UniProtKB/Swiss-Prot annotation:
This is Ribonuclease P protein subunit p30. The modification Phosphoserine is found at residue 251. GO terms for molecular function: ribonuclease P activity; ribonuclease P RNA binding; RNA binding. InterPro entries: Pol/histidinol_Pase-like, RNase_P_p30. Component of nuclear RNase P and RNase MRP ribonucleoproteins. RNase P consists of a catalytic RNA moiety and about 10 protein subunits; POP1, POP4, POP5, POP7, RPP14, RPP21, RPP25, RPP30, RPP38 and RPP40. Within the RNase P complex, POP1, POP7 and RPP25 form the 'finger' subcomplex, POP5, RPP14, RPP40 and homodimeric RPP30 form the 'palm' subcomplex, and RPP21, POP4 and RPP38 form the 'wrist' subcomplex. All subunits of the RNase P complex interact with the catalytic RNA. Several subunits of RNase P are also part of the RNase MRP complex. Its main location: nucleus. The modification N-acetylalanine is found at residue 2. The keyword Acetylation applies. The gene is RPP30. Belongs to the eukaryotic/archaeal RNase P protein component 3 family. It is found in: Nucleus, Nucleolus. Keywords: Acetylation, Nucleus, Phosphoprotein, rRNA processing, tRNA processing. It comes from the Eukaryota.
Amino acid sequence: MAVFADLDLRAGSDLKALRGLVENAAHLGYSVVAINHVVEFKEKKQEIEKPVAVSELFTTLPIVQGKSKPIKILTRLTIIVSDPSHCNVLRATSSRVRLYDIVAVFPKTEKLFHVACTHLDVDLVCITVTEKLPFYFKRPPINVAIDRGVGFELLYSPAIKDSTMRRYTISNALNLMQVCKGKNVIISSAAERPLEIRGPYDVANLGLLFGLSESDAKAAVSTNCRAVLLHGETRKTAFGIISTVKKPRTSEADDDSLPACKKAKCES
């Protein structure tokens, strides 16, 4: 049986509302959720907050509908980048950034989208759904992102709220699918209220409208989400690890870098 995930429940100052989001997600059958803290740099030296602790939300975790297991709550950081300088916080491997289970980036220009796909150490690249896409997707950076294991995220709650956003969501999603062919795509809610979350099978049906095949639409709320989580674990654990290889010791007689006269002396 598939394990469903919603990797974008919006964090807010109201913990009671956040509890309601998590409880509703568990009731709808989601086994994993991520509480998303979104940062948009309006000041040069803006601090990244620590993630919300699960212990602050629940003493006992809600049970997933039909699973008899408690829901798993992860933390996520999304950084909106509209200027190249905003990427520095990711390149500097900030200690606050490493506290989050998932790190996503929302690039606002084509150049920053290219950088996010090819260079930034992130798990997700967010696709705009609330306005017309400001650039065309190109195959090379998207293929690099797929090879690196980076996912692409589409949000569905804006499409529920507004008919204009619905058109943008479907149009931008179809443009993405033409290039990535449904690979590494996840669909999340970005829900701020419990009523904005839909069940995983309903979300998979929305995926068909976004241009995904039936199998890719289901993967967008299950296996592709798991791949993002594994990518995040690898990113966190691989930081600071150095691989060493022991070089076999060679005798002076076998060393080609020695002068011929010295090598002859060694052999004698």
